[in-house]
């Protein structure tokens, strides 16, 4: 089952992306480099729960 997750910027800007993830094939927390438009750079985004 694919669950919705939130990817939060590690730059501390509060910017986030939402996506889905298959928890059965990828049980560990996701970390991916994406573009943060607030600081206008590519930074590390870490998985967080959607509240």
Curated annotation (Swiss-Prot):
Record's Gene Ontology CC terms?
cytosolic large ribosomal subunit
The record ties this protein, via PROSITE patterns, to:
RIBOSOMAL_L33 (PS00582)
Q: Which UniProt keywords apply?
A: Ribonucleoprotein, Ribosomal protein
- Tell me if Ribonucleoprotein is a UniProt keyword of this record: yes
Its Gene Ontology biological processes?
translation
Q: Does the keyword Ribonucleoprotein apply?
A: yes
Q: From the UniProt record, which GO molecular function terms apply?
A: structural constituent of ribosome
Q: Could you say which protein family the record assigns here? A: Belongs to the bacterial ribosomal protein bL33 family.
Name of this chain's protein: Large ribosomal subunit protein bL33
Q: Which organism is it from?
A: Methylococcus capsulatus (strain ATCC 33009 / NCIMB 11132 / Bath)
Q: What is the lineage of its organism?
A: Bacteria, Pseudomonadati, Pseudomonadota, Gammaproteobacteria, Methylococcales
